[in-house]
Amino acid sequence: MAEKENDTKRNTFPYQILFDKYKVSSQIGKGSFGTVFSGVNTTTQETVAIKTEVKGAKNQNCLLESEAYRLSSLKGFKGIPKVYQYGKVKGYNVLVMELLGKSLNELFNQMNRKFSLQTVCILANDMIRLIEYVHEHSILHRDIKPDNFMMGRGDKEDILY
């Protein structure tokens, strides 16, 4: 299932291959509950996000498992990232999902903290649409902020997630 990493790469995750097909690349984020890596599906060559959390960490009740379940229950709606796989790998909970682009906060800062009125209206409409969809499925997102809205990548770069 997981192959131990022998060389020292730019990531701190101890496994290089997950679920026999996802190659872990570099660390792209770290939070209080876990670490996010970019990776590649070795079958399709698609770039993915690999979220990890240590199993049994303090103040943690399988947050990734809950996230995987919730995202899977919302699948198919524009702006909900795809979940490819969730599982446990020797001391870690691991969620493999669609890799997204920059957060709204990053884009706002990149634009010198100014969005046009048209951009604000489009983003507000997309945010409301997403939040309504999530609420219609009895899920309450308790951390709504620009850092938690992401844009897509490639041919999906105009989609808000």
Residues of each region from the PLM?
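Short beta-strand micro-motifs within the conserved protein kinase catalytic domain, predominantly
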Residues: 82-93
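Conserved N-lobe ATP-binding subsite of Hanks-type protein kinase domains
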Residues: 35
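Activation segment signature within eukaryotic-like protein kinase domains
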Residues: 123-124
